[in-house]
Amino acid sequence: MSEIYWKVRAALGPQTLLMVGVGIIVRDEQGRILLQRRADNGTWAQPGGAMDVGESAQECAVREALEETGWRVEITEFLGIYTDPIKMHMTYPDGNQVQVVALQFEGRALEYVGGEDFEALEVGWFFPGEFPENLHELDRPILMDAISNLPRPFIR
């Protein structure tokens, strides 16, 4: 998370903060979806994170995918916006809470360039319907939308 987030958190304390988050559902040539196992809670999630000041949502999605998985990606479609205050509420292991306004994209994998990120314990490719059971609570409905044949964009 950005330095600004931590400054706001320090000033306001443990109350719930509103955060703009960006995620990307990345597919490979076989149609598999790229997920990362998060170091903070061990759940599987799409690449994504908080937007930085001066960054577009698209830039954030591409940056987060590279930082968390080592894959260069390109955006192919806008999946939707997710703002439900209950479904998009998250408590971090340290007890801090956020309500996420999530901008979701779909994309394709271009090239694996590697790298290390302390947010991800591991990464993996999964066919739709074969996702790990321990998906992150915010990601499950987004992944279900991504693999559906329903018209896009979603507004949830």
Please provide the spans of the model-predicted regions.
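Acidic, metal-coordinating catalytic segment for phosphate/diphosphate chemistry
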Residues: 1-23, 95
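Conserved hydrophobic "DFG−1" position in protein kinase catalytic cores
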Residues: 26-27, 35, 107, 125
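Acidic/histidine-enriched, glycine/proline-rich intrinsically disordered or flexible terminal extensions
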Residues: 5-8, 144-156
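Short connector loops at helix/strand junctions that flank enzyme active sites
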Residues: 19, 28, 39-41, 46, ...
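Unchanged
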Residues: 51-77, 82-141, 155-156
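A residue-level structural signature of the nucleotidyltransferase/glycosyltransferase Rossmann-like core
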Residues: 16-17, 32, 43, 123, ...
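A structure-centric signal for secondary-structure junctions around beta-strands
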Residues: 19-21, 30, 120
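Conserved Nudix-box catalytic region and its N-terminal flanking loop in Nudix hydrolases
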Residues: 28-68
